Amino acid sequence: MERTNDSTSTEFFLVGLSAHPKLQTVFFVLILWMYLMILLGNGVLISVIIFDSHLHTPMYFFLCNLSFLDVCYTSSSVPLILASFLAVKKKVSFSGCMVQMFISFAMGATECMILGTMALDRYVAICYPLRYPVIMSKGAYVAMAAGSWVTGLVDSVVQTAFAMQLPFCANNVIKHFVCEILAILKLACADISINVISMTGSNLIVLVIPLLVISISYIFIVATILRIPSTEGKHKAFSTCSAHLTVVIIFYGTIFFMYAKPESKASVDSGNEDIIEALISLFYGVMTPMLNPLIYSLRNKDVKAAVKNILCRKNFSDGK
């Protein structure tokens, strides 16, 4: 790879599943189908929340943000994945790679923060139900969401800026499906200690702190639910949190594997380990956004009722 002072002249090559051409066709069809399901599921959920006034509450406001983040995240990476499966030379420009990495990292970091704010919302709703409308006012929950977005974007700017300063001498083969930051750091022909320190700080801010907020919130939530005398009351209270808790487990289970322990350039050379990490990252990047609308809507009477109302209104207007 030729490297000049102009970073846009640099090209990377994505390995993906190049060693398994038959699997590429299978994965292309599978990922395309999943991406369409992501757009459909999250698009419907966003539309329902926007157009049904009964869902104009803090919980659904955060859920709308979460769905929008899922659409943005997958749209920044899935088209590149699909194109790489079809292309003979799976190359991407340096600038294109950095843009894709920035968007993906920003959306992922923001989603971590949003999940933390959703836990706080459920904590207030269950532990302080009478004060909930006052504490979670429109100004409060909009500010919480805005803070999450700003944190995610700033964090991504910092990580991307540090990555762009690294020299890439000869090895330009990314052992991944997309321009994933850890895979790119492994290609640098310079000391990446600053990047590792920066990533560790990033993990603390957008992974550990939100997870602590979620954990502490649920400790108080469980304690409050256990004090509810009736079984029906306990079930109703827990049902409002079960979807969020399920998403948190899936989301953090995969993302911690990828980002909790940044590795130095020389620490991993195994091709098998690289492809396993890439597949887990693919699961995090595609499977989770596809499942989120299902998890939040299948057992949610409000969402199902809102969908029915919109469909009934559409059928009524079409019949006129």
UniProtKB/Swiss-Prot annotation:
Task: Give the positions annotated as glycosylation sites.
Answer: N5
What topology does the record note for this protein and the membrane? Multi-pass membrane protein
Places the protein is found: Cell membrane
Record keywords: Cell membrane included?
yes
Question: Which PROSITE patterns did the record assign?
Answer: G_PROTEIN_RECEP_F1_1, G_PROTEIN_RECEP_F1_2
Topological domain (Extracellular) residues are 1-25, 76-99, 161-197, 259-277
Q: What residue ranges are annotated as transmembrane?
A: 26-46, 55-75, 100-120, 140-160, 198-217, 238-258, 278-298
The record's keywords, sorted A to Z, are: Cell membrane, Disulfide bond, G-protein coupled receptor, Glycoprotein, Membrane, Olfaction, Receptor, Sensory transduction, Transducer, Transmembrane, Transmembrane helix
Single GO cellular component annotation?
A: plasma membrane
Q: Which GO terms describe its biological process?
A: detection of chemical stimulus involved in sensory perception of smell
Signal peptide, first to last residue: none
In terms of CDD domains, this protein maps to: 7tmA_OR13-like (cd15430)
Give GO terms: molecular function aspect only.
G protein-coupled receptor activity; olfactory receptor activity
Q: List the disulfide bonds.
A: C97-C189
InterPro entries reported for this sequence: GPCR_Rhodpsn (IPR000276), GPCR_Rhodpsn_7TM (IPR017452), Olfact_rcpt (IPR000725)
Which residue stretches, if any, does this entry annotate as coiled coil? none
Query: Which residue ranges are assigned to the Cytoplasmic compartment in the record's topology?
Result: 47-54, 121-139, 218-237, 299-320
Q: Which PANTHER family does this entry report, sorted A to Z? A: OLFACTORY RECEPTOR (PTHR26453)
Q: Which family does it belong to?
A: Belongs to the G-protein coupled receptor 1 family.
Known function: Odorant receptor.
The protein, known as = Olfactory receptor 13C8
**Where does this protein come from, organism-wise?**
Homo sapiens
